[in-house]
């Protein structure tokens, strides 16, 4: 029998990355400060994990100005949404296998 843990996405195994992608899949996009407040994390911690998700092309960055102030928003890419769904499916399989 195949080990269902092998199907878990290594990038999304970190709880903060999973939280970030969850917010971005559930919403069209989200800005840095809102993510920081929602997830109750520091700027540095959030920035580090956002960069990891960007490297994997799971999220995209949208830079703009709002009232002449810079605004950075993040959006889940199709690749990120697919990885998130696969990760959730794998977690479901892990749970189902443990019930046997």
Predicted regions and their residues:
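Alpha-helical DNA-recognition elements
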Residues: 52
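Amphipathic alpha-helical dimerization/coiled-coil segments
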Residues: 1-5, 22, 81-100
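Basic, amphipathic "hinge/linker" alpha-helix immediately C-terminal to the N-terminal HTH DNA-binding motif
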Residues: 66-87
């Amino acid at each position: 029998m195949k080990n269902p843990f092998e199907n878990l996405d290594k990038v999304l195994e970190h709880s903060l990355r999973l939280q970030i992608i969850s917010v971005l899949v559930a919403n069209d996009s989200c800005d840095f400060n809102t993510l920081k407040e929602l997830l109750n994390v520091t700027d540095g911690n959030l920035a580090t994990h956002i960069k990891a998700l960007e490297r994997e092309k799971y999220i995209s960055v949208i830079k703009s100005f709002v009232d002449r102030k810079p605004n950075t928003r993040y959006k889940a890419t199709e690749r990120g949404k697919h990885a998130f769904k696969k990760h959730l499916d794998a977690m479901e399989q892990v749970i189902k296998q443990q019930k046997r």
